[in-house]
């Protein structure tokens, strides 16, 4: 596990993703009127003179603009940008290329810090053009990815992840290679690619230093959540249950530990209880909020599948008791997921019995081949008609 003091050596939290999280909470009905959250956000805005972002969130959250505050912050921004421009001009006239780059970088970072997204993007591109070092170029690209994560600008994120991958192939060091994996993992969570997220996160558990995105316990929490939904049971055991770095942190995250082990140890009632807690957490997370219902549904299916695979048949009553729910609830759940083809079982409501119906892999492959063959044949026939014409 990374030493705690490594956090001080990491990149600056610019933009600060915690502010994006706080702003997101204020969009939810239960937090919309939360005075403490609003005060926390306004304090951060005042401290950094974030005039552009203040205007943005007032529009998005429906707040009344404090015109005096906005005017003061804009004036501070104007003075600071003038000083930064003067420093750039002086460096261009009197100093070397490195000093010119540093002056441009300071302006880029300032524009990013105050929430002027468009100006920050332009300034970072200009700084990138004046940067020769591969490592420094990668740092600028990482900054742009963070800017994209702050605003959830998917185009900005994907373009710069692609650019970072290209630069890494040109010869990036191990620290930046690992940092890119963490950034890719975070974005994979945001777009619901949990399998990719699990791969990226598990690859960097022992080398994590991306404290500009999150602290290490939060990283481990994400890692466990995505690994549980993405990995088969044997890989979950080898990479998470037996992962010493993860287990060390889980001592301080009892809720995550109990969620993980309740599923692995087939304690389904406890699993359901902890899944409800996970649902609340994911709903309040700005990155994964759009997918929290999907995650919870897939984890329910995973729990049902794991139980059903242990039996040829079992009673609805036993299954309901295993999950700590009513027979009516489990009956509705099974009917829904069986009809959708997500569970391989059939329910005898008269006898109150659930019979498993494991698919034969060879038969499934045969049916899939026939289906693909039919599709190919139809396309060939359509193509032949076009050619004949």
UniProtKB/Swiss-Prot annotation:
Protein name (record): 26S proteasome non-ATPase regulatory subunit 6
InterPro entries reported for this sequence: PCI_dom, Rpn7/CSN1, Rpn7_N, RPN7_PSMD6_C, WH_DNA-bd_sf
Known function: Acts as a regulatory subunit of the 26S proteasome which is involved in the ATP-dependent degradation of ubiquitinated proteins.
Domain PCI residue range list: 193-361
Stated family: Belongs to the proteasome subunit S10 family.
UniProt keyword terms in alphabetical order: Proteasome
Signal peptide coordinates: none
A single Gene Ontology CC term: proteasome complex
Pfam hit, one: RPN7
Gene3D superfamilies recorded: 1.25.40.570
Coiled coil location: none
Residue ranges crossing the lipid bilayer per the database entry: none
An individual GO BP term: proteasome-mediated ubiquitin-dependent protein catabolic process
Gene: Rpn7
């Amino acid at each position: 596990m990374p030493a705690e003091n490594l956090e001080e050596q990491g990149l600056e939290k610019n933009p600060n993703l915690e502010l994006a999280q706080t702003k997101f909470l204020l969009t939810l009905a239960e937090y919309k009127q939360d005075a403490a959250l609003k005060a926390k956000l306004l304090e951060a805005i005042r401290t950094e003179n974030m005039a552009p972002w203040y205007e943005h969130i007032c529009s998005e959250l429906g707040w009344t603009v404090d015109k005096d505050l906005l005017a003061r912050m804009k004036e501070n921004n104007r003075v600071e940008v003038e000083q930064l421009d003067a420093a750039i001009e002086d460096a261009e006239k009197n100093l070397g290329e490195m000093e010119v780059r540093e002056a441009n970088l300071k302006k880029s970072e300032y524009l990013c810090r105050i929430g002027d997204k468009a100006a920050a993007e332009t300034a970072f591109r200009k700084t990138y053009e004046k940067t020769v070092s591969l490592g420094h170029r990668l740092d600028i690209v990482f900054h742009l990815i963070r800017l994209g994560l702050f605003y959830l600008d998917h185009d900005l994120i994907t373009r710069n992840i692609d650019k970072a991958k290209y630069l890494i192939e040109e010869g990036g060091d191990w620290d930046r290679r690992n940092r890119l994996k963490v950034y890719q993992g975070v974005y994979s969570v945001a777009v619901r690619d949990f399998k990719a997220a699990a791969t990226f996160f598990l690859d960097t558990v022992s080398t994590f230093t991306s404290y500009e995105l999150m602290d290490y316990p939060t990283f481990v929490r994400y890692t466990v959540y995505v690994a549980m939904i993405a990995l088969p049971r044997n890989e979950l055991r080898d990479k998470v249950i037996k992962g010493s770095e993860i287990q060390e942190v889980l001592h301080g995250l009892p809720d995550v530990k109990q969620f993980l082990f309740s599923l692995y140890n087939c304690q389904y009632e406890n699993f359901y209880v902890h899944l409800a807690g996970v649902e609340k957490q994911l709903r309040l997370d700005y990155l994964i909020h759009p997918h929290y219902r999907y995650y919870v549904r897939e984890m329910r299916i995973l729990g049902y599948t794991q139980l059903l695979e242990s039996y040829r048949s079992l009673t609805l009553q036993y299954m309901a008791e295993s999950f700590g729910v009513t027979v009516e609830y489990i009956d509705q759940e099974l009917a829904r997921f069986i009809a959708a083809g997500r569970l391989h079982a059939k329910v005898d409501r008269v006898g109150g019995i659930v019979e498993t119906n494991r698919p034969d892999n060879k038969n499934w492959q045969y049916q899939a081949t026939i289906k693909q063959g039919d599709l190919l044949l139809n396309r060939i026939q359509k193509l032949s008609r076009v050619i004949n014409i």
